[in-house]
Every structure is written in structure tokens, then in C-alpha cells.
Design a protein with these regions (language model features):
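N-terminal cap/lid segment of alpha/beta-hydrolase-fold proteins
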Residues: 1-27
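Active-site glycine-rich loops that stabilize anionic/oxyanionic intermediates
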Residues: 33, 37-41, 116-117, 250-251
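Alpha/beta-hydrolase fold nucleophile elbow
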Residues: 105-116
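Alpha/beta-hydrolase-fold enzymes
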Residues: 122-209
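Short beta-strand/loop motif that positions the catalytic acidic residue
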Residues: 246-248
Length: 309
């Protein structure tokens, strides 16, 4: 059976000890995959996916971002990155984990997987650190609808001025997530947009480390990140030869029900990326790794990874 090893490393912010996990296979290591998780969640939720890949010869590593999971030092810190430049701190922490893991497994291909906010962080990462990756999987991503993001960033700035960057803002939370259930029939909870699997939704709601309201500071950081990854001059810094696999559900509001994911995919092609694939799952919602057809999703990811080794 695969085995888990938990460890910590010093964050780029010089203050926090970032919590991380490594899942290793019993036998030969064929490749490494690093996971960047989404907003208001943590890496323990990825344990089944990590085990699945480890059973197929992958070392899988992941860390709780600043303000998330076991990296957050208290409840107030949940969904807060830093007083200043938090987005870049989180991306730099991803790079630290990459370097630590690549040094440990120097002779095998290295992949990066990012989901939701982690997809935006991953898209930032491949701009700022384009080297050393055999491929990238981008899950549950979205597009930058310019004026909306600019307005959200301004609102977050005003909230920071009025209440401070660590303020957990109901206004920003509603702006970000308030409309996500609107297209579904028979809505049971406010988080039905995550997945059709009710047990997963209930576990998320019951988890004290999941579902924290976004702080003004983190929301401001994330809007800045969305602006950064949409600029042509930044996209041109990517290694165009790195394979990229976009995957999402066509019932995911974060990706505008597949339409925004298609636009990001097309933007990568227009930028000159040579190996880009898009997979949309019918009726799938935001967390395809936790959907009713997750076995199919796992198998598709593995098939793509294997094709790039």
C-alpha cells in the first residue's frame, strides 16, 4: 500500500511553517505530481487521489497554502495569505515544495496539478517558473472577465481600508459564491455547486478547516492573480512546449459551465502552446475529483500523465 509522510517547511513569508504531505508508492517511482489545492479547503481532501496515483507509481506531494488547513495557525488566519504580496508568497511556497521534491527524486518526470484557486496559482506558477515541468493539469479553472475582476479587486481594497485585510467579508463572499447554485434544480445546501455527491458536500460542511469566508486581503490577492494570468505579456513567458490538460465539469459555475474553460484553453492555443487538451464532463460540477464519476476522472488523468512520461 502507498504510505503518507507529513512534514513542514518554512514559508516564503518567513513566519509560517507550511504543512505538506507526500504519498509514496510501494515500488518503483515513475514520476512525481504536485497538487495545488483550492480556496477554503486543504490537502487531506486529496488523499484518495494521491493514493490512486501512488498505486500507479507516482510520488504525490501537496501543501496547505498560507491561510489554509494546518498551515493556518488559528481560525482567524483561515483564507488569509499575508498583509502584502500574499499571492506571490503562495506561489513561492509551491516552488519551494517543487525544489525540495525534485531534489529528492531528480531522475523522474515532474507534473503539477492545480484545482480551482490552485488552478490560478498553477497558471501563475508556469509563468513565473516555466522550467522543470513535464506537464500540467488544470482543474476547475475560470476566465478573467476583466471588469468584474477589477470591480471585485476595488471592493476588496475598500473592505481592507474599512476593516483590515484579515476581515472575513460577507459581502465579498456573496459576490464570489452567491450565485453558484442558480442553475441547479432541487438545491439542498448552499454548496451543492461543489459536486453532485451529497456525502462529499456534507463532509465539507462539517469540516472546520473547510468553507471559511474569504478575507478582504486574500480576495484582493486573488483578483490580482487573475489579472496577472490573463495578460498576454505574462502568458508569453510560459514554456510553450509544456503539455497542458484542462479538465472541468460542464455544470461548474466557476468555469461558467464550460464556456470560460474553453476560452482559457483557446487563449493558451493562441499564445502558441503546442500540446493542449480540453476535457469537459457532462453534468459534472466544480470538484471533478469528488464527483459521482470520479473513477472515470481519475483514469483519464492517469492516462494523460502516462502519455507524457
Amino acid at each position: 500500500m502507498p504510505s503518507f509522510h507529513d512534514f513542514r517547511f518554512l514559508s516564503t513569508d518567513g513566519k509560517h511553517n507550511v504543512f505538506a504531505r507526500e504519498c509514496t508508492p510501494d515500488g518503483e517511482v515513475r514520476a512525481v505530481l504536485q497538487i495545488a489545492h483550492g480556496v477554503a479547503e486543504h490537502i487531506y481532501r486529496y488523499a484518495p487521489f494521491m493514493e490512486f496515483l501512488a498505486e500507479n507509481g507516482f510520488v504525490v506531494v501537496a501543501n496547505d497554502h498560507l491561510g489554509h488547513g494546518k498551515t493556518a495557525e488559528n481560525e482567524q488566519e483561515l483564507c488569509f495569505f499575508a498583509e502584502k504580496d500574499g499571492w506571490n508568497d503562495v506561489v513561492s511556497d509551491m516552488d519551494t515544495l517543487h525544489k525540495l521534491t525534485a531534489a529528492k527524486y531528480p531522475d523522474v518526470p515532474y507534473f503539477l496539478f492545480g484545482h480551482s484557486m490552485g488552478s490560478f496559482l498553477t497558471r501563475t506558477y508556469i509563468i513565473d517558473h516555466p522550467e522543470g515541468l513535464k506537464g500540467v493539469v488544470i482543474s476547475g479553472t475560470g476566465q478573467n472577465p476583466g471588469a468584474v475582476v477589477a470591480a471585485g479587486k476595488l471592493m476588496a481594497k475598500l473592505e481592507m481600508i474599512d476593516n483590515g485585510p484579515m476581515y472575513h467579508s460577507p459581502t465579498l463572499d456573496k459576490l464570489a459564491f452567491g450565485s453558484y447554485n442558480k442553475k441547479y434544480d432541487h438545491v439542498r445546501t448552499k454548496l451543492d455547486w461543489l459536486t453532485r455527491d451529497e456525502a462529499v458536500v456534507d463532509a465539507y460542511i462539517a469540516d472546520p478547516l473547510c468553507g471559511a469566508m474569504a478575507t478582504a486581503g486574500m480576495f484582493h490577492d486573488m483578483m490580482g492573480g487573475l489579472q496577472y494570468i490573463w495578460k498576454t505579456e505574462n502568458l508569453n513567458k510560459m514554456d510553450k512546449s509544456t503539455p497542458v490538460y484542462f479538465m472541468a465539469g460542464d455544470g461548474d459555475p466557476v468555469g461558467n459551465y464550460g464556456e470560460a474553460v474553453k476560452k482559457v484553453y483557446e487563449r493558451f492555443l493562441k499564445t502558441g502552446c503546442k500540446d493542449v487538451k480540453l476535457k469537459l464532463y457532462k453534468d459534472g460540477r466544480h470538484e471533478m475529483l469528488n464527483e459521482l464519476n470520479k473513477d472515470e476522472v481519475y483514469a483519464d488523468i492517469l492516462e494523460w500523465l502516462n502519455s507524457k512520461i
